[in-house]
C-alpha cells in the first residue's frame, strides 16, 4: 500500500487506514491541531468496498448485515439523506442489520440525529475502529469523505448515496427517497403554548452563508408568510416583525428542531436540512437555492416548491463566506417577486 501525503489524507475519497490496521476518518484528523503518522487508503483492505475507487453492486436480498465505515457525513442535511439511503436498503431486505461507524469528532448536533435513528435505521459505533474487529465475511462499505467524490456534486444526493452503497437508484421507488423514516423517531413535545396551534416556520440560516437568506430579505419574507397564512411566523433568531416569534431558546437540540419542523403548517427556508426534515414529515415547503440546483436535493419531494437563483459563478459551490459571493446572493434576492412566490 502507498502512504498518502498530508493533503491526500485530508481530501481522500474514502476513509483511512493506519499501519496497524485502525480505520480513521479524515474529518477527525482535520479537527486536530496537527497529526502525524502514516495513513493509507482503506479501500480494498480486507475486502472493504469503496464506490469512488471501484464501482460495485450488491444484492442486499442475500446480505444479513452491512457495515458502513465513516457514514453518512458531518452535516445534518447530508446525514438525513444518507440515513434515507440506508433505510431504503430494506426495500430489498426488511431484516437487514446496518451498522454505521461514525467519525469520532463529528459535530454534536449532527450526532444527535444518529442517536435518534439508532435502533430505527442503524446501530452506531465510532471511529477509530480496528478493521479486524469486523468479520471479513460480512459486507463492509467505505462511504467516507463523500464531499470529495466527483459524483457528489453531479448527482441527486440520494442517488449518490445509493450508488455508494452498491444500489442502482432506479431500483428504489421515489416514495422511499423522501426521508419518511423520520416519522418513526421519538421527539419531544412542543412547548405548551404551541401545541395544537397553527404556525409557519421561517428558517433562513443554512450551514454556510452562501446558502443562507440575506438579512435584508428576512422581514419581507416573514411578511409574505403572514399575509399568506395569517398565523404566527416562528423562526430561529431575531426578525423585527409584529407577527414573528423567535423560538431559538426553545430549540436547543436536534430533536427540538425536528419537532418544530414536524408540526409546522408550512416551512420557508434556504436550509436544506429543514427541507429534508419537512419532506420526511410531509410538511409543505418553499425552498431557496443559490448555488446548488434544486433537482440535486428535492427531486423526490412532491410538497416542495423550489426557487432557484441561477448565479453562474456560484454554480455547485458548496460553501462560501466571501464578500463578493454574498453580495451576489443578496442581489439575487432583491429580484424576488414576493407576490409570485411559489407555494406548495
Task: Give, region by region, the residue ranges found by the protein language model.
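Catalytic machinery of carbohydrate-active enzymes
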Residues: 1-344
